[in-house]
A protein has these predicted regions:
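Conserved mixed alpha/beta catalytic, RNA-binding, or beta-rich assembly cores of soluble enzyme
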Residues: 104-110
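Structural signature of WD-repeat beta-propellers
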Residues: 22-23, 73-74, 111-112, 152-153
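Short loop/turn segments that connect beta-strands within beta-propeller blades
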Residues: 31-35, 82-85, 120-123, 161-165
Length: 188
């Protein structure tokens, strides 16, 4: 495309394939051994009357649990995809600039309006949604122990219960905005 969103997500390796999202809305696989192309699937098709409306980038890093991939596109598609075949397992509307996190039960996404949403990893059904940080420009989420952790534009780090979505704690990490998903190191 002639116009794309600034940034790019990291590729992931699942078994013997490399998988990445691209600025044309496609998710594609390549053989790790020789780079030969495998499957590709259009997850976030461009639509609209002008270049801005047709932005369809997949800039968030693809997340994996076992053989399942989870990816969110700029225009608003959150999808679960089978790594070996590229077959869509489920898809939901979820516009995000910041990405997502995954644990054994749920997929967590920081929405474009700073809402935090949990979807069932298996079915894609909404488990909970919390809008207490609306318009606080939250970072991408991190799944940590029994919490989902995000930062915000004032330097606060917020901890939510991963099962219920209730706010558990808030700490000031500094005066600067938190722009990246919080990093979990071991049990800290």
């Amino acid at each position: 495309p002639r116009l794309s969103v600034r940034g790019t997500g990291a590729a992931v390796v699942v078994k013997d394939i490399v998988i990445g999202g691209f600025d044309n809305g496609k998710l594609a696989s390549y053989a790790l051994a020789d780079g030969s192309p495998g499957w590709d699937v259009l997850l976030d098709p461009p639509a609209g009357r002008n270049e801005i409306e047709r932005l369809s980038d997949i800039n968030a890093t693809v997340r994996t649990i076992g053989d399942d991939l989870y990816v969110v596109g700029y225009r608003g598609q959150l999808s679960a995809v089978a790594a070996e075949s590229g077959q869509a397992l489920w898809s939901q509307d979820a516009r995000s600039y910041e990405g997502l996190a995954v644990d054994l039960q749920n997929v967590y996404v920081s929405g474009a309006g700073s809402e935090l949403t949990a979807l069932s990893r298996v079915s894609g059904a909404e488990v909970w949604k919390n809008e207490v940080l609306k318009n606080r420009d939250i970072s991408g989420p991190t799944a940590w122990q029994n919490s989902v952790v995000v930062g915000d534009f004032e330097g606060y780090v917020h901890f939510f219960d991963s099962a219920t979505g209730e706010l558990q704690a808030r700490v000031r990490a500094g005066g600067d905005r938190v722009t990246s998903p919080p990093l979990a190191l071991n049990d800290m």
